[in-house]
């Protein structure tokens, strides 16, 4: 049922008995207020410097542009429009020019203080739009200017605050002083509170040994923090790589996507320990898987000790050539045979995976040298079936001694392995020539120059195997089988 409109009261001279009664009736239609009161009205005009507000007073109220918003240097047209209903606080009923001066932002400020004080009392969060970046933090519009220190924006300090402009942020009120017009906020406190339950649930589901994907969120001297999806875990510098590194930035950068293994979850301290290297193959296991005892491999002398020489055969893999395995003759000190930095072809004589040790021999590598090139000796492993027959590479036809069509990738891989084996053989040949020249020149001298120096690219560059070489290799292998 519709309610009939009630007409506004009309005042006429005939309605009242006297002029005094008439003035009293008019007086009742005029609003009265004092400085500091909050009044309501309708925007009737918007100029560049001020806004006119009809509040039912004898004159329209004036809101200067600076009193429209807590933002600085605003365009009135961006804040209000004609016809808007707004609240304003009376700054002065009559200035020197007889104008009623109002403030929209002060009315908003007074209303906001009551709301904020209530939220602070209940320990609840406040929402606001970031309107400024100032020295040391952000300014939020929460009905008044709330200050959010940079150190309290996130769980860790944020360097660039510009991306937060215009964003709505929820934060806890940690300091409130109306007399000083001071409101300090903390988004970190809000994050800690709201994420506590989420973190607990996440940590409860995170099991030791689990493999997770994450993003590197920050790097410190002792490791890298990885965001697993709301919870950060630490990859200690010792768990970043199998090889020795001086700083985490040698392995990862902020923003990198990584796969890590969960090493430990400390529920009490809410800390997660992670490992990047645990998701990668141990280089020692890789070496043991790809090398056999008896193979001759290239290396570089890295260190001399009284009992022998250490030779690096792969990144992160060093083996010992005992002094007794340096040469056939008696050697007093290792530098009679080799020097740090020398390239050397050595034979793998033992692999101890549990103790992460490999034993190498320069002497046996030279003893095993034959002028006929044998790829199997230099890392090109042979494969045989249960009957002892050699297994040829996929795509190679042993009957025609040719590669089949469609196996270009397999052929390229095989030929690359062949070329590498041939390169190692040439390095070994150069080493043998140097040893022979040294023995002939020294003829009994106890001092010998290093086993080898870095051969030229021309001397050591491997070449791809031709079909004729493949056929010859097939005949050799078939004969030895």
UniProtKB/Swiss-Prot annotation:
Signal peptide as annotated in the record: none
Disulfide bridge positions per record: none
Compositionally biased tracts (Polar residues): 445-457
Ranges where the record places region Disordered: 437-465
Keyword annotations: Repeat, Ribonucleoprotein, Ribosomal protein, RNA-binding
Gene Ontology BP terms: translation
One term under GO cellular component: ribonucleoprotein complex
Its biological purpose: Binds mRNA; thus facilitating recognition of the initiation point. It is needed to translate mRNA with a short Shine-Dalgarno (SD) purine-rich sequence.
Protein name, as recorded: Small ribosomal subunit protein bS1
Organism the protein comes from: Mycobacterium leprae (strain TN)
């Amino acid at each position: 049922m519709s309610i009939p409109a009630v007409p506004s009261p009309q005042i006429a001279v005939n309605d009242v008995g006297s002029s005094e009664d008439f003035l009293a009736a008019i007086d009742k239609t005029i609003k009265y207020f004092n400085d500091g009161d909050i009044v309501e009205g309708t925007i009737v005009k918007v100029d560049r410097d001020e806004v006119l507000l009809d509040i039912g007073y004898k004159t329209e109220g004036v809101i200067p542009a600076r009193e429209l918003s807590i933002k600085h240097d605003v365009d009135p047209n961006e804040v209000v429009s004609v016809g808007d209903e707004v609240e304003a606080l009376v700054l002065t009923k009559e200035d020197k020019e007889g104008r009623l001066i109002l403030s929209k932002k002060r009315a908003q400020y007074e209303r906001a203080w009551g709301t904020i004080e209530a939220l602070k009392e209940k320990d609840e969060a406040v929402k606001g739009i970031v309107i400024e970046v100032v020295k040391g933090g952000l300014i939020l519009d929460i009905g008044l200017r709330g200050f959010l220190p940079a150190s309290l924006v996130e769980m860790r300090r944020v360097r660039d605050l510009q991306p937060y402009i215009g964003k709505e942020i929820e934060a806890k009120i940690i300091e409130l002083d109306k007399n000083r017009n001071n409101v300090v906020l903390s988004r970190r406190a809000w994050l800690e509170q709201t994420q506590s339950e989420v973190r607990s649930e996440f940590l409860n589901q995170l099991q030791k040994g689990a493999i997770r994907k994450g993003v590197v969120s920050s790097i410190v001297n002792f490791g890298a923090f990885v965001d697993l999806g709301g919870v950060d875990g630490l990859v200690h510098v010792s768990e970043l790589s199998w090889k020795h590194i001086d700083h985490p930035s040698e392995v990862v950068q902020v923003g990198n996507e990584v796969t890590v293994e969960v090493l430990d979850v400390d529920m009490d301290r809410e800390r997660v320990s992670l490992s990047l290297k645990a998701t990668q193959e141990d280089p020692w296991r890789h070496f043991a898987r790809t090398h056999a005892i008896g193979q001759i491999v290239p290396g570089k002398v890295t260190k001399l000790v009284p009992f022998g020489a250490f030779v690096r055969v792969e990144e992160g893999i060093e083996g010992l050539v005992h002094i007794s395995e340096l040469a056939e003759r008696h050697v007093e000190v290792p530098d009679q045979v080799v020097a740090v930095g020398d390239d050397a072809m050595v034979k793998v004589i033992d692999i101890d995976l549990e103790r992460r040790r490999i034993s190498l021999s320069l002497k046996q590598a030279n003893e095993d040298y034959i002028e006929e090139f044998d790829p199997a000796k230099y890392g090109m492993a042979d494969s045989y079936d249960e009957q002892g027959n050699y297994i040829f590479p996929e795509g190679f036809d042993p009957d025609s001694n040719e590669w089949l069509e469609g196996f270009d990738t397999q052929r390229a891989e095989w030929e690359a392995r062949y070329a590498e084996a041939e390169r190692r053989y040439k390095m070994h040949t150069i080493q043998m020539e140097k040893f022979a020249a040294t023995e002939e020149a020294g003829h009994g001298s106890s001092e010998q120059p290093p086993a080898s120096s870095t051969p030229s690219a021309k001397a050591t560059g491997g070449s791809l195997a031709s079909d004729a070489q493949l056929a010859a290799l097939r005949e050799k292998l078939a004969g030895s089988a």
